[in-house]
């Protein structure tokens, strides 16, 4: 046993001293000193046990060994709290040393248990708890009399106070041990997660409490670059828990996330202290479904997910994605629908979007060219004189945004009519998509790009028709009331509203080829995820910032819309685990 104790003590000191290697900052120093102090206490307790051979010394030694791995991991966390990038080699060494500490602790506590005293410490006899006074076999009146008599005895009072204090300390000890046990479980085995949003409806509803299994995913040693080996290969359709890549990965953020996960699990997912700078709960971690695998390119068009592998010649639909993707929450059974808080797109709105998708798919670009040329010729006749200037710059980039453009349709129409260069601008705007799509060199264009070129042409045709109708009304000296109530104009504006509605939600139904490079594919050990509730899921398709984006990237004067599409894959090390069980509410309890 002496040699065994020396190995434990030496390991503890080595671990504590290594905390400051290549890591000289204040918290690392504090963690190292704390580890050395605890290691010294461990050595002192062992020496006292060997010298006194008393049961009290054994209990103290056993309790210190009980806390040994927990104190060491706390010292490690303290030493890494402000480290931007800790050296992998040192992190790996310390992690392996800690696992050694945990194993040695288990063996040591086993040796120090009461049932093993006779074998390892024959000179030490366990102290049995004595009853302060006995009431066994006494009648109620006699019991009361004995209690009252004993309470007048100062020695008895002291024994009672002593016993109460011991019991309190044991409760505190049990509470701390439970906290540390939960910490280890949360780091290496399970994580409790309470669903905060409806991105995975109908699989998960707001308030569902699920358990994620972390061990197969190779959990990371806290606040370090070291991970246990991953032996889980994710499949399409797996539901995973992952760190949100949209949040900055800073030492402060990592520490806050770590502490919040501990509090979250201790409070059974009732308290979340992981908030952003505005005090709002972070959407972190996320629960999403794996939809893209290593070696794949992805594309989402009209709500259909397509995949292409390196040896494929074309994109093919992912049939199984339709089993998970939900576009029409209103069609769910009433038992599920009543649990949903927000249904952004109902069945009728979905039909409108699908009608736009069918309309743009059916548009022949050659026919669109002819229609566009007809509109330009019609405007030339209406204006009645040829421009003598180049195309006037009527619009700034922001004014090409769909809603802004159509809101200003009457103003733009009047400027086209009255400005020298107005006709030239109209011709330039309406035909700017011609060069690329008439070049014959469009084979490299993706299905997404073709569909959005068709949508861009549809919107421009609609805008051109509105401009023509406005100028016709101007020429006819229509009154304001006639202008506002004109049926042809209002029908075109209604069509424009349909396109605007589609563009407002197109970020959820469409995504261009990802990864974008011709020879780029999702790399090894990386995955792509989306939520099942595609209209209400901010996932790996999206970023947090909306940017003004061209509907047709090959059109210099394209219609613009606000897009937050910026797809990203997630390295396997960012995946925390897979969901295995829904535990609450009990009405939805079940394996996943």
Which residue stretches match the model-derived regions?
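Soluble "head" domains of membrane/secretory-pathway proteins
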Residues: 1-168, 203-592
């Amino acid at each position: 046993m002496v040699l065994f104790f020396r190995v434990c003590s030496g390991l503890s000191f080595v671990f504590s001293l290594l905390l400051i290697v290549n890591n000289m900052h204040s918290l690392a120093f504090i963690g190292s000193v704390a580890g050395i102090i605890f290691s010294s206490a461990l050595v002192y307790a062992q020496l006292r046990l060997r010298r006194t051979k008393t049961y009290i010394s054994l209990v103290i030694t056993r309790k210190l060994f009980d806390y040994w791995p927990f104190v060491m991991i706390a010292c490690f966390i303290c030493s890494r709290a402000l480290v931007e990038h800790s050296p992998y080699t040192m992190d790996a060494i310390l992690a392996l040393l800690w696992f050694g500490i945990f194993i040695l602790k288990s063996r040591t506590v086993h040796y120090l248990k009461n049932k093993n005293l006779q074998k390892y410490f024959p000179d030490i006899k366990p102290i049995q708890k004595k009853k302060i006074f006995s009431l066994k076999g006494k009648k109620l009146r006699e019991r009361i009399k004995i209690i009252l008599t004993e309470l007048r005895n100062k020695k008895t009072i002291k024994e009672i106070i002593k016993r109460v204090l011991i019991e309190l300390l044991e409760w505190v000890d049990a509470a701390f041990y439970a906290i540390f046990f939960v910490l280890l479980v949360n780091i290496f085995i399970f994580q409790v997660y309470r669903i905060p949003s409806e991105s995975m409806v109908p699989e998960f509803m707001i308030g569902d409490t699920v358990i994620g299994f972390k061990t197969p995913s190779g959990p990371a040693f806290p606040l370090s670059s070291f991970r246990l080996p991953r032996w889980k290969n994710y499949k399409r359709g797996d539901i995973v828990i992952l760190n949100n890549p949209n949040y900055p990965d800073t030492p402060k953020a990592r520490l806050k996330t770590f502490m919040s996960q501990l509090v979250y699990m201790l409070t059974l997912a009732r308290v979340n202290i992981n908030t952003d700078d505005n005090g709002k709960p972070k959407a972190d971690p996320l629960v999403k479904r794996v939809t893209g695998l290593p070696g794949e390119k992805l594309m989402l068009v009209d709500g259909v997910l397509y995949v292409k592998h390196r040896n494929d010649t074309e994109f093919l639909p992912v049939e199984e994605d339709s089993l998970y993707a939900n576009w029409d929450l209103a069609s769910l059974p009433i038992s599920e629908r009543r649990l949903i808080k927000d249904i952004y797109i109902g069945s009728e709105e979905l039909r409108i979007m699908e009608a736009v998708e069918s309309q743009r798919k059916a548009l022949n670009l050659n026919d669109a060219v002819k229609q566009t040329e007809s509109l330009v010729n019609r405007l030339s006749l209406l204006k009645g004189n040829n421009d003598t200037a180049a195309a006037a710059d009527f619009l700034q980039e922001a004014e090409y945004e769909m809603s802004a453009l159509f809101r200003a349709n009457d103003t733009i129409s009047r400027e086209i009519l009255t400005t020298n260069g107005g006709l030239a601008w109209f011709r330039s705007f309406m035909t700017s998509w011609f060069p690329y799509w008439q070049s014959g060199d469009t084979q490299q264009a993706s299905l997404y790009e073709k569909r959005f070129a068709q949508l861009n042409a549809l919107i421009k045709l609609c805008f051109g028709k509105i401009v023509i109708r406005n100028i016709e009304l101007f020429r006819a000296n229509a009154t304001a009331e006639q202008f506002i109530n004109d049926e042809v104009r209002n029908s075109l504006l209604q069509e424009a509203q349909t396109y605007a509605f589609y563009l407002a939600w197109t970020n959820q139904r469409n995504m261009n080829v990802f990864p974008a490079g011709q020879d780029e594919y999702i790399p090894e050990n990386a995955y792509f995820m989306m939520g099942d509730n595609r209209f209400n899921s901010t996932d790996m398709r999206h970023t947090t910032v909306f940017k003004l984006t061209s509907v047709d990237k090959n059109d210099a004067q394209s219609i613009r819309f606000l897009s937050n599409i910026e797809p990203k894959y997630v390295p396997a090390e960012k995946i925390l685990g897979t969901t295995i069980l829904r535990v609450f509410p009990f009405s939805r309890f079940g394996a996943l």
